[in-house]
Design a protein with these regions (language model features):
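Short alpha-helical segment of the dimerization/phosphotransfer core of two-component systems
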Residues: 121-126
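Conserved micro-motifs of the catalytic ATP-binding
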Residues: 141-146, 184-187
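Conserved catalytic submotifs in the C-terminal HATPase_c
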Residues: 147-152, 169, 174-183
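Short helix N-cap motif at coil->helix boundaries in the Bergerat
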Residues: 153, 234-245
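Short helix-loop "hinge" at the ATP-lid/N-box region of the Bergerat-fold HATPase_c
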Residues: 203-204
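Conserved glycine-rich
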Residues: 209, 276-277
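Short beta-strand/loop element within the Bergerat-fold HATPase_c
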Residues: 210-222
Length: 298
């Protein structure tokens, strides 16, 4: 009788534990599916093994989500820090010039003009930074629509080069338009001109004095690939995955001295994404970089 009673109790405990494990499994399974009210799948066979596998998979998913959240938080901190630095530099410069003028510089016409010009340049840099941030925000939210049309790519490259010709001449960089005439693509002309201008400015800032920046193109399926090639300082491989991030700079001192906002390549990326096209970069440290964009071929 004692043995029968013991067996009955043991069987009851086993069924109780088994039922609770099944309930736990259904709960974990439903949570993975994003459901809180729908019963999960019924289990058969190795209950503990299935629970173990399900919990491990659920833990891996949570760890992945945590890693993504940590990466976003790191990006947010870097963005705020970089933005504060980009705003602080011109503001402090402007403040210094104005204080110098107030402390006696106004009496010297030469110093007066020089410091006012420098303060004006600082204001222009702030305006450019705010405008670029506003543009990126609008591109991300889809507020800015594209006015697509058929574009002569050779002419687009030519007009874009004319806008940066003075800056290129100051560093002795030769701009070469190797795009054949009558190469037609489709897109928003104003935005694509901004893309090329930003890529040219990047090539000028990081290019080699007396070097060359060349634009070439070739068809690839229904797309037209456009390559902007420079023979400048190039980039190490570890920089390439981040080069299109806001405020990310490879050569911080040179680009800041040139007065860039640090948003040029980020804007390029967003404009290309708005066109449902791509931009990629290949670079060799000490040998130069190649930025490639795709456009819809006509």
């Amino acid at each position: 009788l004692l043995v029968v009673t013991y067996g009955t109790v043991l069987f009851g405990i086993e069924r109780f534990v088994h039922a609770r494990i099944k309930a736990l499994y259904r709960t974990v399974h439903d949570l993975r599916r994003g459901s809180t009210g729908t019963p999960g799948e019924q289990m058969k066979g190795d209950v503990l093994g299935q629970v173990h596998a399900e919990v491990r998979a659920w833990a891996r998913e949570r760890n992945t989500e945590i890693a993504e959240l940590e990466a976003r938080e790191q990006f947010r901190r870097e963005f705020i820090g970089n933005l504060a630095h980009e705003l602080k530099t011109p503001i402090f410069n402007i403040q210094g010039y104005i204080l110098t003028l107030l402390e006696g510089g106004l009496e010297d016409e030469r110093v007066n003009r020089d410091f006012l010009d420098r303060a004006s340049n600082g204001v222009d840099r702030l305006i450019k930074l705010v405008e670029d941030l506003d543009l990126i925000t609008k591109l991300e939210s889809g507020v800015i629509g594209l006015h697509e049309e058929d574009i002569d790519l050779h002419d687009l490259v030519r007009t874009s080069m004319e806008g940066v010709d003075l800056a290129a001449n100051e560093r002795g960089i030769r701009l070469v338009n190797a795009v054949p005439a009558a190469t037609l693509v489709r897109g928003d002309r104003a935005r694509l001109e901004q893309v090329l201008t930003n890529l040219f400015n990047n090539a000028i800032v990081y290019g080699r004095e007396g070097g060359t920046c060349t634009v070439s193109t070739y068809p690839l399926g229904e797309q037209q690939v456009v390559e902007v090639t420079d023979d400048g300082i190039g980039m190490a491989k570890e920089h390439l995955p981040r080069v299109f991030e806001r405020f990310y700079r490879v050569g911080k001192s040179r680009s800041r001295n040139e007065g860039g906002s640090g948003l040029g390549l980020a804007i390029v990326k967003h404009i290309m994404e708005a066109h449902h096209q791509t931009i990629t970069v290949k670079s060799t440290e000490g040998a130069g970089s190649i930025f490639s964009i795709t456009l819809q071929r006509v």
